[in-house]
């Protein structure tokens, strides 16, 4: 529905979701969606090829939902992917898509309270597959209290030839001298 334009969204914790369109340097508000059932919306990601929009909601509910993006740029067909009665053990936060083909791949959700990442099928009904955590090695400390994730699954540079995973780490632990939150950059090869 965006006809080759770039799009972005804003998710307000207890309010609406805004859909924006970028054309060169111009930014236009296309639509605002009422996310009335959300207690505290956190992360979001578009799946362009499958016309899906995913939102995570933390605190009381701990839910990940998918919506279909219609040709009129409306969010429709709300579907509950997972919640704390299922496979979510902390607050669902960041969301990212790992594409394995045009329409297939995985939805990855970071969980702040449990410092884990859940893997779901990219296609409806978004079946839970597994979870993982990022452990300490000779280069980094364990990722804890994570609030976000992003994945690029194509050549990034010689250090990340098959792609890169960027995760927010709430605090440094172990022998690290920097105690503040930071970002970890990991090779996509480590997830395969």
In which residue ranges do the predicted regions lie?
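Single conserved hydrophobic/aromatic residue that forms the stacking wall/gate
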Residues: 1-8, 12
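Structural signature of eukaryotic scaffold interfaces centered on beta-propeller domains
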Residues: 5, 42-50, 93-103, 148-160
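Short loop/turn segments immediately following the C-termini of beta-strands
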Residues: 13-14, 56-60, 111-112, 168-170
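Short loop/turn segments immediately following beta-strands, especially the blade-tip
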Residues: 19-27, 66-74, 119-127, 186-192
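Beta-rich catalytic cores
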Residues: 40-42, 60, 91, 113, ...
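Conserved blade-ending motifs and adjacent loop-strand segments that build the rim/top face
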Residues: 81-93, 127-155
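Loop/turn-rich, solvent-exposed surfaces of beta-rich toroidal or solenoidal domains
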Residues: 86-132
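Blade-level signature of beta-propeller repeat domains, shared across WD40, Kelch, NHL, RCC1
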Residues: 148-192
């Amino acid at each position: 529905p965006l006809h080759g334009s770039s799009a972005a969204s804003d998710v307000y914790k207890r309010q609406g979701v805004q859909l924006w369109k970028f054309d060169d340097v111009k930014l236009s508000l296309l639509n605002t969606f009422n996310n009335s059932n959300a207690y505290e919306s956190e992360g979001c990601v578009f799946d362009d090829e499958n016309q899906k929009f995913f939102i995570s909601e933390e605190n009381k509910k701990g839910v990940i939902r998918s919506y279909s993006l219609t040709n009129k740029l409306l969010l429709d067909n709300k579907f509950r992917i997972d919640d704390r009665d299922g496979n979510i053990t902390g607050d669902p936060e960041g969301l990212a898509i790992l594409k394995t083909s045009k329409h297939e791949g995985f939805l990855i959700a970071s969980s702040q309270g449990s410092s884990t990442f859940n893997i779901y099928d990219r296609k409806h009904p978004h079946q839970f597959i597994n979870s993982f955590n990022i452990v300490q090695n000779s280069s980094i400390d364990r990722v804890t209290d994570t609030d976000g994730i992003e994945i690029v699954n194509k050549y990034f540079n010689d250090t990340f030839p098959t792609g890169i995973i960027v995760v927010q780490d709430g605090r440094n632990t172990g022998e690290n001298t920097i105690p503040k939150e930071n970002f970890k950059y990991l090779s996509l090869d480590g997830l395969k």
